[in-house]
């Protein structure tokens, strides 16, 4: 094994690497000059057959040659990879100065935003969000809530009846589109052991014509609390907290006696007009469109849960008491943002939703 032969093998490998114009050609040269059948690999195997005194010198010579070959291979591979990457950047370059068609961002509907905001107030107080079916059994929608069989709300002119089992129709079907979210409360009392603290947002249906102040499909949010020792004071404090969180710490509320089948005693809750703060009452120089110069805005109905409702839903009225409250989201949104026509909320016109922001 002559030194000049080893040098020739090394030089041929270096020349082949330098001549490779791309990574594929370099791979072929690599196999030819560093693979198992390459000249340097064969020379390395022949070292074992040399006399002992010649092995060290031959091994050193072959090792130096193979080291130079591997170093040159790595350097050439790095060069070719850099050239490839630069070429790809040029070929796949994107001209960021070109104009493009802007896709407008969407906006959450203000009804959704406000309903979630109200629900968050109660969730922060420890209430749980509860949901139920919109196509509801008449028992949950009326009977469980102490609506008598002859109550006007159960008539077809006020309620959407759905075709029931075996083709029964009208008020004989026993199935309705829920007229309020109160059936969720009845289901919750039947499914859970007290204490129960829930808030129930959702869509409800009534046979109203779509006009500036009515819609047959609207949204309600109700809450229910069932526990030992609850009183009207707890209800008043809870609702005061909601109003002050949503409208400001200086907001005042009042309760007016009323009647609802599912609560006893019952009341309508009003809050001080957040626009005029009551200063428009008896003051023709400062009329207020929001409260019609009455100084108060009606929020919704509330009261202590009727013992008959507790009994129907499996709760012992001798041990537990509860309170409930509910109001319509659309009406409250009309007050908050001076929306004059409720149809704007349901027609899907982005010109209505966009100004409310909340882009996603």
From Swiss-Prot:
Its EC number is 6.1.1.20. Mg(2+) binds at residue 264. GO terms for biological process: phenylalanyl-tRNA aminoacylation. Binds 2 magnesium ions per tetramer. GO terms for molecular function: ATP binding; magnesium ion binding; phenylalanine-tRNA ligase activity; tRNA binding. Keywords: Aminoacyl-tRNA synthetase, ATP-binding, Cytoplasm, Ligase, Magnesium, Metal-binding, Nucleotide-binding, Protein biosynthesis. It catalyses: tRNA(Phe) + L-phenylalanine + ATP = L-phenylalanyl-tRNA(Phe) + AMP + diphosphate + H(+). It comes from the Bacteria. Its cofactor is Mg(2+). It is found in: Cytoplasm. GO terms for cellular component: cytoplasm. CDD domains: PheRS_alpha_core. Pfam families: Phe_tRNA-synt_N, tRNA-synt_2d. It is an enzyme of class 6 (ligase). Tetramer of two alpha and two beta subunits. NCBIfam families: pheS (TIGR00468). Belongs to the class-II aminoacyl-tRNA synthetase family. Phe-tRNA synthetase alpha subunit type 1 subfamily. This is Phenylalanine--tRNA ligase alpha subunit.
């Amino acid at each position: 094994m002559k030194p000049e032969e080893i040098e020739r093998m090394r030089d041929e490998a270096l020349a082949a690497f330098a001549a490779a114009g791309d990574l594929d050609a370099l791979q072929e040269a690599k196999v030819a000059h560093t693979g198992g059948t390459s000249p340097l690999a064969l020379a390395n195997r022949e070292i074992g057959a040399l006399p002992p005194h010649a092995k060290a010198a031959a091994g050193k010579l072959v090792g130096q040659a193979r080291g130079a070959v591997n170093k040159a291979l790595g350097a050439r591979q790095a060069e070719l990879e850099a050239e490839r990457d630069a070429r790809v950047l040029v070929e796949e370059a994107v001209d960021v100065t070109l104009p493009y068609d802007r896709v407008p961002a969407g906006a959450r509907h203000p009804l959704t935003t406000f309903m979630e905001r109200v629900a968050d107030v109660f969730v922060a107080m420890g209430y749980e969000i509860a949901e139920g079916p919109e196509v509801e059994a008449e028992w949950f929608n009326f009977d469980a809530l102490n609506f008598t069989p002859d109550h006007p709300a159960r008539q077809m002119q006020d309620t959407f009846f759905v075709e029931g089992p075996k083709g029964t129709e009208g008020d004989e079907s026993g199935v309705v589109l829920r007229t309020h979210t109160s059936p969720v409360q009845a289901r919750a009392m039947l499914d859970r052991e007290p204490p129960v603290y829930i808030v129930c947002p959702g869509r409800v249906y009534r046979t109203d014509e779509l006009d500036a102040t009515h819609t047959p499909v609207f949204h309600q949010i109700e809450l229910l609390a069932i526990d030992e020792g609850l009183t009207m004071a707890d209800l008043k404090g809870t609702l005061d907290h909601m109003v002050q969180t949503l409208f400001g710490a200086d907001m005042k509320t009042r309760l007016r006696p009323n009647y609802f089948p599912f609560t006893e005693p019952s009341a309508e809750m009003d809050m001080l007009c957040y626009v005029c703060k009551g200063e428009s009452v008896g003051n023709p120089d400062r009329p207020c469109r929001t409260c019609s110069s009455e100084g108060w805005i009606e929020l919704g109905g509330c009261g202590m849960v009727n013992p008959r409702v507790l009994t129907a839903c499996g709760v012992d009225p001798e041990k537990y008491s509860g309170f409930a409250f509910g109001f319509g989201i659309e009406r409250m949104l009309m007050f908050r943002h001076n929306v004059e026509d409720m149809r704007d909320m349901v027609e899907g016109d982005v010109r209505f939703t966009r100004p409310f922001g909340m882009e996603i």
